[in-house]
């Protein structure tokens, strides 16, 4: 969605989108394709498209995505977030999505903490470096950090996952749920 907003506002050229990623995105968007296929194909294109962009542009389009698309979350997911918050659970988003989007979603849903892939900026310009959070190794490191920070008992914890990168996270908790 963020990539599409960058195209809509003429921040990046739509030619790259149509030549490289549109069909894979449409398959995933209709839930007919695999998210990992979409992620692999678009990740490099997305990162290359952001190189040299001012953080203000990225923040503006991110805000538009949250404003217009943040309710496009599965009903089940929303109900589980609400249930956990209503029961005073610590709720943490660990996502491979860009951290600047994950933070905005976490704020919208009033969760305890979050982490996403870290996109690095130099002098307010994206420099092309991404510290990923979509793989099992990165997610395990994040989990370890949150366990220490919040004194979490993983045997009593829940995890929800929808990608291959979530498998080890699901194995680590007492209440794993694959979506």
Predicted features and spans:
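Active-site phosphate-binding/coordination module
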Residues: 3-6, 10, 117, 133
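A metal-dependent, Asp-based hydrolase signature
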Residues: 7-83
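C-terminal cap/substrate-recognition subdomain and adjoining C-terminal extension
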Residues: 60-61, 67-179
